[in-house]
Amino acid sequence: MRKGALKDPEIADLFFKDDPEELFIDLHEIGHGSFGAVYFATNAHTNEVVAVKKMSYSGKQTHEKWQDILKEVKFLQQLKHPNTIEYKGCYLKEHTAWLVMEYCLGSASDLLEVHKKPLQEVEIAAITHGALQGLAYLHFHSLIHRDIKAGNILLTEPGQVKLADFGSASMASPANSFVGTPYWMAPEVILAMDEGQYDGKVDIWSLGITCIELAERKPPLFNMNAMSALYHIAQNDSPTLQSREWTDSFRRFVDYCLHKIPQERPAAVELLRHDFIRRERPPKVLIDLIQRTKDAVRELDNLQYRKMKKILFQETRNGPLNESQEEEEDGEQGSNLNREVDSLGSIHSIPSTSVSTGSRSSSVNSMQEVMDESSSELVMMQEDEGTANSSASTVHKKDHVFVRDEAGHGDPRPEPRPTQSVQSRALHYRNRERFATIKSASLVTRQIHEHEQENELREQMSGYKRMRRQHQKQLIALENKLKAEMDEHRLKLQKEVETHANNSSIELEKLAKKQVATIEKEAKVAAADEKKFQQQILAQQKKDLTTFLESQKKQYKICKEKIKEEMNEDHSTPKKEKQERISKHKENLQHTQAEEEAHLLTQQRLYYDRNCRFFKRKIMIKRHEVEQQNIREELNKKRTQKEMEHAMLIRHDESTRELEYRQLHTLQKLRMDLIRLQHQTELENQLEYNKRRERELHRKHVMELRQQPKNLKAMEMQIKKQFQDTCKVQTKQYKALKNHQLEVTPKNEHKAILKTLKDEQTRKLAILAEQYEQSINEMMASQALRLDEAQEAECQALRLQLQQEMELLNAYQSKIKMQTEAQHERELQKLEQRVSLRRAHLEQKIEEELAALQKERSERIKTLLERQERETETFDMESLRMGFGNLVTLDFPKEDYR
């Protein structure tokens, strides 16, 4: 997707559809930085005064710039607090985002720039109080500013403190990005990629540094290279207030903010209860400070205006300056400029390493505007001196201090000439709208100039920031990749465990079904065997009964025949009596046989019942044996499955352990590679910085050497002038002496006296000339020696400074390397402990599961045996009640089918 195409509805809703160039008019540049430029503007529809921050998202790092714009817009939309800048909207125009906010007079840093001295303690407390209220609001919503400094703490006309510039802000806490401005960075931000995450406490550190900045006009380590300052902050003690004039309350507040350990650093809400913030102060302290600053800015701009008007007046009246006048004027302006730069020391020129978008497009050069506008006033002054003076006084007739031409519409202008067009521009200058500010015109001009001059340093810092950001992305990408790999590995192992559990469950179900089928089959076989056994006994008993009945019939016949024979032999017994005796005998025999048959049937029934009962008992015992065999088979199967599961878990643990060690090694290797690359880049940056400083010093020395002949010539001319003055004095003295001698000596001696005086004058002039030559030679030698010594001293001081910075870098890198190695060792130990603990838990789990399985085995077998024993006892008791004795020793009959 092309950046700015706004195809995503959610992104499109972030921007207004109006044309910003038509909506906002009278744009005047009021600030410049790495992101681009900030303009004063007026809403053409509502006449509301606003500030417009233009951010280009074209060129290099387009995607990053666009994402940063989206992040800042989303961040600003969330803010609703009196101590944060009010967001008005955002517009897009030709790959440039117009971020519109409420207009503020300037920043706390501008106060230092204008007054050229630290703020008073009550003023610092008032500014800090407002900033803390804004930070408390941000931190409550888990937001981090990450670029707190005096330049980002703005002031409004009523004296309201506003936090601004959220280009570095984070919408998540904790965070771990390397962002901010070097001198104000907290140690944990510098070490973010190496040691982990940070939270809103980084803003508290930056606020403490800002307090020192307001109290000493610049932050600690400001005279140091920005990169070296990072190394210094990361490994040295926290800075403190240097001067003893500050109160103990202020000192404690700063020390409280600058605790090295983030956990010991207070939160914003805690600092709001600090006595430094809560103590009484004048209610209008900030309003009075703003008014004094506006008055001072008015005077500065008036002074600059008068200087430019004087220069242009001289050029118009006298033409170009001659060489000597030009050199003198250049020297004066150069010394003034050097004094101004040395005294002010622009803090805004420090490039912020926050994610920001750079816009190289800006308005016309403000100095050119001042020159053009001054020339216009000059034309009017030539026409009417009184009008010119009046115009000069009305340039700053209100609190509106300085003026900028409309941004983006400046064209190269011709040399100032008293023409009609110049007069019209002068009229435009007089009638153009002014606006209130606490930032002088020269400060804005210097910011633009320094922004252009320090492009190399800014690019170096930006490149370093991009490298750290890229390294962080690489680490996050690798961590995500390793996490995905570990998740996939664990999912695979989990599936394997689930598959094993499912297979085990299926096997147990199959075994249970098999055992049920076996039991049912055995029951059917037992029922068939019992039926067959009963039928066999009944058949045998039927056969025995038949045999017994046949035997009785035979015996009955024999007895009958025997009785008949006995009766036939007995002839004495009457026939009737014989018949009766035979009948009675038959009846007795039949009765006996009937009793014997009944007894046999009873015995057979008892035998049948007893043997059937015994057979049932045998079937029951056999069923018990089958149940015991089944439960042992099931328990053995479970044990085998559990052992296989445990072996699989051990294998999984070992494979996970190998993967964890391999991933840790991969992550640590990448981290060390990135640190080596970072250290190499830092070293290259430092060497490049050293070379640049040496080149600048060499260039300065070359310029001094080139300038030395002019300086020597001027000094030689001064000595020559002294010599000429001395010669004139001696000539006058010679004339006076000659006249006196001629008056007091006879006329005939005049010739000799004149010759003597002439020789004496010649001798003295020769001595004077020799002294002159000697003075010139000594002066040249001393100046050359002095220049050589000064340059050598500067070279020595620079070498010492660069050596100290290099040693600081080496110490920082050694510390980072040692900390990283210690971190790696801790990670390895932590992993070893985790692996060891996990293995111990696994072994304990295996032991517990085996013990539980053994307990289950014992309990189930015990339960089964007890149940079977109760069942056997119940069966035997019932057998006893049925009249059967001990069935255990009962033998089957020989004809038993078994």
UniProtKB/Swiss-Prot annotation:
Residue spans of biased composition, Low complexity class: 349-366
Protein name: Serine/threonine-protein kinase TAO3
Coiled-coil parts of chain: 452-502, 548-649, 754-871
Any one cellular-component term (Gene Ontology): cytoplasm
Annotated positions binding ATP: 30-38, 53
Alphabetized UniProt keyword annotations: Acetylation, ATP-binding, Cell membrane, Coiled coil, Cytoplasm, DNA damage, DNA repair, Kinase, Lipid droplet, Membrane, Nucleotide-binding, Phosphoprotein, Serine/threonine-protein kinase, Transferase
Any one biological process term the GO annotation gives: DNA damage response
Positions carrying Phosphoserine: 324, 343, 346, 349, 359, 442
UniProt PTM: Autophosphorylated. Phosphorylation at Ser-324 by ATM following DNA damage is required for activation of the p38/MAPK14 stress-activated MAPK cascade. Phosphorylated at Ser-324 and on Tyr residues during T cell activation. Phosphorylated by LRRK2.
Subunit composition and interactions: Self-associates. Interacts with ERN1 and TRAF2. Interaction with TRAF2 is facilitated under ER stress conditions, such as treatment with tunicamycin, and may promote TRAF2 phosphorylation. Interacts (via N-terminus) with STK25; the interaction promotes STK25 abundance at the level of protein expression and/or stability.
GO molecular function annotations of the record: ATP binding; protein serine kinase activity; protein serine/threonine kinase activity
UniProt induction comment: Up-regulated by a high-fat diet (at protein level).
